């Protein structure tokens, strides 16, 4: 007669705990998978084109071809696509030398608005024709392809920073902004503080140029923090924040490929800026970028994109 041995109580408890934990992991993984797909669908808004005319073909993401992004920050309390793009940043990403170049374009830059045939401030393009007109205008201004875009409602951006658990920046001088005090030196900022930090310009002798520097700091900090994200428990809140404030033409498969093939470039970010004198023309104040400075930046970015 076979004798059935009783399983010791501690082993039964351990088995139950392991089983519950395993099922929880599977359940959470399924939740994340569904959430990622849902968020990717929610934020996906393609451009009215297959690829940039200045490139002539789609970027080979799997082949690790250098690519460019337009980051448009819309300082608005309304919908993501309302208002003007007060933040215009171009990112070129080269996975071969594992580097990113981040270029700020002043919002008051005087240039042709493609699609209207007028010479105005570059941030007017967003108000007239959304991200499509902004992409076309920036491409024409810098003479480089803009392969993809990411549009962010800056009011909602603070939710992304909070979901990441905050970001680190290095402040050049002490100032107050939005009811917050920012001391000189290394700072750790939550979402509300990061937004106030990036908006300040009146206490900076450089005005919008200083503001642009702080915006680039925050963007770089988010890129680095996102790349180093180790806790899977943050993923749900990050997806919620992204869904509320971000729009992009990237598909989910492209996002996965970029995460896999381009992420190492995030550890080497060079911050650049186009600067120029402020001039009053027809009663309006513009930033006028010289042809020499613009052409030099174009050459630098085209080389980084391996186009020349």
Please report, for each region that a protein language model flagged, where it lies by residue.
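Second-shell loop/turn segments in exported
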Residues: 76-80, 120-128, 143-148, 202-209, ...
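Sec-exported extracytoplasmic/periplasmic mature domains
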Residues: 95, 110, 114, 127, ...
């Amino acid at each position: 007669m076979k004798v059935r041995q009783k399983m010791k109580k501690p082993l039964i408890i351990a088995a139950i705990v392991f089983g519950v934990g395993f099922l929880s992991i599977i359940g959470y993984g399924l939740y994340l998978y569904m959430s990622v797909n849902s968020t990717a669908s929610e934020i996906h808004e393609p451009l009215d084109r297959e690829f940039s005319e200045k490139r002539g073909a789609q970027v080979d993401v799997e082949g690790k071809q250098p690519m460019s992004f337009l980051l448009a920050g819309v300082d608005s309390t309304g919908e993501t696509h309302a208002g003007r793009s007060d933040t215009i940043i171009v990112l070129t990403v080269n996975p071969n030398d594992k580097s990113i170049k981040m270029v700020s374009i002043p919002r008051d830059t005087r240039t042709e608005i493609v699609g209207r045939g007028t010479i105005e401030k570059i941030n007017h393009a967003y108000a007239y024709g959304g991200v499509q007109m902004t992409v076309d205008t920036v491409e024409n201004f810098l003479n480089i392809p803009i392969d993809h875009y990411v549009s962010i409602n800056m009011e909602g951006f603070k939710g992304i920073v909070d979901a990441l658990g905050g970001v680190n920046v290095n402040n050049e001088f002490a100032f107050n902004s939005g009811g917050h005090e920012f001391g000189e030196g290394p700072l750790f900022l939550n979402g509300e503080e990061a937004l106030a930090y990036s908006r300040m310009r009146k206490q900076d002798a450089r005005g919008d140029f200083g503001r642009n520097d702080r915006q680039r700091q925050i963007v770089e900090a988010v890129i680095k923090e996102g790349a180093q994200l180790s806790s899977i428990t943050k993923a749900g809140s990050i997806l919620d924040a992204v869904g509320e404030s971000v729009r992009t033409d990237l598909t989910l498969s492209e996002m996965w490929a970029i995460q896999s093939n381009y992420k190492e470039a995030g550890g080497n970010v060079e911050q650049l800026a186009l600067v120029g004198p402020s001039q009053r023309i027809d009663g309006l104040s513009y930033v006028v970028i010289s042809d020499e400075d613009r052409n030099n930046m174009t050459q630098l970015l085209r080389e980084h994109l391996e186009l020349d």
